[in-house]
Regions:
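Substrate-binding pocket helix/loop in short-chain dehydrogenase/reductase
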Residues: 75, 103-104, 108-116, 211
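Conserved glycine-rich Rossmann-like NAD(P)H-binding loop of the short-chain dehydrogenase/reductase
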Residues: 36-50
Length: 255
C-alpha cells in the first residue's frame, strides 16, 4: 500500500482566504504543490505579493479574488467568480482573520463587531457559500483556522479568543449537518507561528522566552507546520476525519 499517494489533491479546486501572506500563503502553496488549482481570497486583490505568479509557475491555475470577509457583497462576488471560472469547488481553507489586542475594559463595540464579522461571521458565510457547490457535488473538504486561543485564555485578546473558540464549535456544527453529503469539516488550531503577524511580538526576547516556556517542544512553529496539516485534512488520507480541531501547539495546551 502506497500511503504517500493519498496525501494529494490532484485536480481539485481550492479556495484559501487571507492568502496573501503568512499561514494563508503557506496553505495555498502547499495545496498547489499537491496538485490543486487555487482561488486566492484577498483583502486587496492587487496585493497578493506575487503568490498567483508563484502558483502558475508550478503549472497550476491561480484566481485572485477581492474578498474582505467583513463585506458580504465581496464574499458573494467572489463566489460568483469561482462559479464562472471553475463551476466547482472542492476545498476551502478559511484562514482569513484579525487578531486585535485590547484589554476587555477598552474594547469598543466597533472593535467587537469587526472581529466577529471577519473571524466568525466570515468563516460561517464562506463555508455556507462553498456548500452550494459541495452539496451538489456530494464532495467537499472545509478546513477552518481556529487557534490555541480558542482553548486557553490570553489576556488582552478576549474577543479574538472568543471567535476562535466559536470556530472550533462551528466546525462541529457544519460537520454534523453536512456529513451526509460527503463533506468533511475540520479545523486546525496553531500556537505562535513565525509569520508577518507575529514577527514584531516575537522579536522581543522576553516575549519569545515566555512563548518558548509554554511550548513543550521548546520551539516556535513554521508556516509549513500548519500548511502540512491543512493539506492532510484536505486529502483522501483524512476521509474518515470530520468535526475535529487539530491542535498544532507544540504541547502548550497539555500543561
Amino acid at each position: 500500500m502506497k500511503h504517500s499517494s493519498e496525501v494529494n489533491v490532484q485536480g481539485k479546486i481550492a479556495l484559501v482566504t487571507g492568502a496573501a501572506r503568512g499561514l494563508g500563503r503557506a496553505c495555498a502553496l502547499a495545496l498547489a504543490e499537491a496538485g490543486a488549482d487555487i482561488a486566492l481570497g484577498l483583502r486587496d486583490v492587487n496585493a497578493d505579493n506575487g503568490l498567483a505568479k508563484e502558483i502558475k509557475a508550478m503549472g497550476r491555475k491561480a484566481l485572485p479574488l477581492q474578498m474582505d470577509l467583513s463585506k458580504m457583497e465581496e464574499i458573494h462576488a467572489a463566489f460568483d467568480q469561482i462559479k464562472k471560472h471553475y463551476n466547482r469547488l472542492d476545498i476551502v481553507v478559511n484562514n482569513a482573520g484579525v487578531a486585535p489586542e485590547n484589554l476587555i475594559e477598552n474594547v469598543t463595540e466597533n472593535d467587537f463587531d469587526y472581529t466577529l464579522s471577519v473571524n466568525l461571521k466570515g468563516t460561517f458565510f464562506v463555508s455556507k457559500a462553498a456548500g452550494a457547490f459541495m452539496i451538489k457535488q456530494q464532495y467537499g473538504r472545509i478546513i477552518n483556522l481556529s487557534s490555541q486561543a480558542g482553548f486557553i485564555a490570553l489576556p488582552g485578546e478576549a474577543v479574538y479568543c472568543m471567535t476562535k473558540a466559536g470556530i472550533a464549535h462551528l466546525t462541529k456544527c457544519f460537520a454534523a449537518e453536512w456529513g451526509k453529503y460527503n463533506i468533511t469539516v475540520n479545523a486546525v488550531a496553531p500556537t505562535f507561528i513565525y509569520t508577518p503577524g507575529t514577527e514584531q511580538y516575537l522579536a522581543n526576547e522576553e516575549n519569545k522566552k515566555h512563548v518558548l516556556s509554554k511550548i513543550v517542544l521548546e520551539k516556535i512553529g513554521e508556516p509549513k507546520d500548519v500548511a502540512n496539516a491543512v493539506l492532510f485534512l484536505a486529502s483522501p488520507a483524512a476521509s474518515m476525519i470530520t468535526g475535529t480541531t487539530l491542535l498544532i501547539d507544540g504541547g502548550w495546551t497539555i500543561l
